[in-house]
Amino acid sequence: MYAFKKKYFLIIESIKDLDLRNIKIHNKFNVIYRNFNKSENIDGIKKFRNQCKLKQIKFFIANDTKLAVAVKADGLYISAFDKNLKSLHYIKSNFSIIGSAHNMKEIKLKILQGCNYILLSKLFKVDYDDKAPHLGIIKFNIFCNKTSKNLVALGGIKIEKLNYLKDVNCNSIAILSELKKKPA
């Protein structure tokens, strides 16, 4: 039996990575667009953002406040390496702020940055880096108990690991690499 969560965060690196027609449930999904590939034009991103709005999918831009404002995104995603506190003034507007962290020190920084949700990484071992440390379910749950913020499980979440998510003490999960796989 799979564990159902209140929110799902889908992290994409290109607007071509996700076909929104496959999302049937409204108000549960959030798309985080990591604009590493600067070749996508702003009009294409605006069109994708409008498609998200029609499907009631929240759309976030990673690490680029100017682009987030330009495309009228629902909010901003702040990576773990961004230690800047400038994002605080966006709290008063209708922007939501999502952050990313790997340890308790970074979680505290994301709270100072005004994050509504904090993606805590890596929950499970990841394929792309065998030696990278991962938290595991027990340590992740300890972090959840130490903070009042909404922590989101990220990292190593694959189809075969979905059953383990019922033991994770959080309401949301984030998926990156599973989105890139081609359907069978």
Where in this protein do the model-derived segments appear?
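Alpha-helix-loop-beta-strand connector modules within alpha/beta enzyme cores
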Residues: 44-60, 83, 87-103, 133-156
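Glycine-rich phosphate-binding active-site loops on the catalytic face of alpha/beta enzymes
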Residues: 76-88, 117-134, 156-184
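Conserved, mostly hydrophobic/aromatic
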Residues: 31, 68, 110, 118, ...
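Structural motif
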Residues: 26, 71, 113, 146, ...
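Short, acidic/polar
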Residues: 11-24, 63-66, 102-109, 158-163
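N-terminal active-site wall of soluble small-molecule enzyme domains
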Residues: 17, 27-91
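Internal catalytic-core helix/loop-beta-alpha segment
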Residues: 94-127, 132
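Hydrophobic faces of well-ordered beta-strands that scaffold small-molecule active sites
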Residues: 6-12, 29-33, 59-61, 76-78, ...
